[in-house]
């Protein structure tokens, strides 16, 4: 709901286009109105919403407006959880009651050794009494075992594997940290730090691989199921694949030979089922290629030229 934040955590992975800026995004889409948020939620048949920042409670009125809209549109069973680096007091919690189902607190790293003496512990007790599900969600950092005394106050303690990011890379290098490998964003040693916490059913660990490979893939698949055009193939990763022809001459009745669901005429190009383009491309004048991208007009993952392959 905003990229603004009152803190400057050295490990914050928020991207440059969001960090420190009062901008709103729904998933990866920049939104400028409440209706944009509803449209994005509907595009993936969302069963719930996570409200994040920056710091959401810096724009409390915005949070209340959006959560009210979501509950009214999708019904009371639409689960809403909110992340915050603040310790909400009773007036703030009262504003959120009936709208936010679950609060995930992010106490600053330096407060962990005295966690029971902080406003976060007091906020957890108050929120639980007011009917919220309440927990702590933080990255795996050295000293995370200091949070164990707070477990009796919480419904959960979520630990995210510390991740390397563009905006926090310099700070991580200064601390002697490095990526686990060249394929993933996990920081070397983060999983070991998480092991400081006792085995407890309230403690949950989310690996970087799970977040990137499972959570993102499932979200993309939900969006693709609702938004893919009839001629687009949905992959196991949730991306969509289609063929593109940029014609430079007459197509001699080619489009008339296709079913209407097999193509779409766009400005300067024709988008179609990739297998149709592969099968018939040799006789068509113009540039031909296959596109793989995130669904609903999302990021392009790969473009494969077909001209040479068709000639071969």
Model-derived features: where do they sit?
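Canonical Radical SAM [4Fe-4S] cluster-binding loop centered on the CxxxCxxC motif
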Residues: 1-31
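Canonical radical SAM enzyme core domain
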Residues: 19-35, 57-98, 102, 106-118, ...
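Short Fe-S-cluster ligation motifs
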Residues: 33-55
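Short, well-ordered coil/turn segments that N-cap beta-strands
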Residues: 45-47, 76-80, 99-101, 130-132, ...
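Short, acidic/turn-prone active-site loops that include or flank metal/cofactor-
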Residues: 107-112, 161-165, 290, 294-296
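Radical SAM enzyme core and accessory elements
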Residues: 234-312
